[in-house]
From Swiss-Prot:
Keyword Hydrolase: no
SUPFAM superfamilies: L35p-like (SSF143034)
GO biological process terms, semicolon-separated: translation
Gene3D superfamilies: 4.10.410.60
Native species: Synechococcus sp. (strain RCC307)
One cellular-component annotation, GO: cytosolic large ribosomal subunit
GO molecular function, one term: structural constituent of ribosome
Protein's gene: rpmI
Name of the protein described by the UniProt record: Large ribosomal subunit protein bL35
Length: 66
């Protein structure tokens, strides 16, 4: 059977944890930051776990991740 291709766009956006979960960046942290509080901007700078309902979709895009 041939090797499966990784979707390169997904490979740049997701990271795998040791337990097999996927991490992602948070939205709303690119521009228009003047009116957002420092606390909110710190929070938006952290990584988030991909929801369990989206886990299968991400894992199909990244067949060799974990």
């Amino acid at each position: 059977m041939p090797k499966l291709k990784t979707r390169r766009a997904a490979a740049k956006r997701f990271r795998v944890t040791g337990s097999g979960k996927f991490m992602r960046r948070r939205a709303f942290h690119n521009h228009l930051l003047d009116h957002k509080s420092p606390k909110r901007k710190r929070y938006l700078g952290t990584m988030a776990v991909v929801d369990e309902r989206d886990h299968d979709r991400v894992s199909h895009m990244l067949p060799y991740a974990g």
